[in-house]
Amino acid sequence: LIYRPLGFKFTVEAKVCYYQLYLRVYGGKRMRKHVKGNVSWVGYIDWELESFHGDDYSIMNGSSQNAYLIEEEKTVLIDTIWTPHRFDFVENLKKEIDLKKIDFIVANHGECDHSGSLTTIMDEIPDTPIYCTANAVKSIEGQYGKRGWNFNVVKTGDSVDIGNGKKLVFVEMKMLHWPDSMATYMTGDNILFSNDAFGQHFAVEELFNDKADQCLLNKEAIKYYANILTPFSPLLKKKLAEIIGFNLTFDIIAPSHGAIWRENPLQIVEKYAAWAEDYQEDQVTIAYDTMWEGTTKIAHKIAEEIHRQSPDTVVKVFNISKADKNDVMTEVFKSKAIVVGSPTVSNSILSSVAGWLEFLKQLKFKKKRAAAFGCYGWSGESVKVLQAKLEDAGFEVIDENIRSLWNPDDQDFDQIPGLVTSLLK
């Protein structure tokens, strides 16, 4: 914490050691936080997290791994937290409850940021039943080995009584975003433990959406959807329709990352429904990289021309090598069209653009238009390469393009209005 402002970065192992030292010196512990009724949050807020899924997802405002403790006639633990924090998680949980009083554990998802403390807690209570999907058994045993745990496989519509007139109802959420994913609905208190769905990588000490910075909350929610869930939008639409068809009441939606939706919880469901419909706003995103600034000049001229022809259209311009790739992809998600540029290098395009286009392809955007541009000195293949990759990524690529020999001049710039007119049709 002391060295972060000076620019030092730590490995995960170093962060764990540092935090354990902090606990010894200062006696800190993460107390439970009340959610509703007999439900508490017992997770971990990670203010220092900088990336997720390796370095594939940038974390700008911290994150959390949310686990929940239900204490009705039966005591239930909903999910655990990430592996590096597993010992602290279990020790802190012991301060809140006798672990032997836990009647069963619900594993909504087998990924290690949710199941990473299972091995440690099961060492303490090895016979405790674990409720999860059949695919979750495979993913959990695949990661941690076959340990003879007492798995109880559930599917959509299955339920378990937890006393006081309440029960947990399970809903499979296959490919949102793993094959093993599910959500758990608690009757009586009307809480949906949605796991990764409806989450954000966002640290909120106060837990709830109505206590969070609304601008950051909305920014992180759409970033999460755009960069993680977009490929699964068709499945998401079907799953939302299925859940709505259950005619359930939602007082709280409690995801496994970020803020808990307490105030108007259906707002995030409505946003997901809109985002799943091949979402786009009146926006165009220009993404490029450059060698000697010629491609930059074209990018800026295209932005100016879009504004001239369509003043209400939002235009975003990013140098891919300098901008955060997840932020750029969020803007692509919001856009009706994109324009991608690269100079020619080694008969192809810059590696920064090539890698970004591969990520673009993975997200499976639909119903978006695209155009290409770039400078060259000799053979000039970059535009054709860009067009082919954009088509492969599912974009409707227009024929108009800008290929500039050496540095762009007025003759090149004179082609831009035609490109923009075609792009905005």
Predicted features by range, described:
Residues 9, 13-30:
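Short, Lys/Arg-enriched N-terminal segments with co-localized hydrophobic residues
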Residues 32-95, 183-186, 190-194, 284, ...:
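Conserved beta-strand hairpin/beta-sheet module of binuclear metal-dependent hydrolase folds
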Residues 33-37, 132-181, 235-239:
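Metallo-beta-lactamase
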Residues 74-76, 104, 190-193, 252, ...:
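Structural motif
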Residues 78-80, 102-110, 131-133, 192-195, ...:
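Active-site neighborhood of phospho(di)ester-bond hydrolases with catalytic His/Asp-centered motifs
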Residues 84-130:
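Active-site metal-binding motif and surrounding structural segment of the metallo-beta-lactamase
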Residues 117, 323-328:
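Short acidic active-site motifs
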Residues 204-207, 214-253, 257-260, 301-316, ...:
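FMN-binding flavodoxin-like domain, especially the glycine-rich phosphate-binding loop
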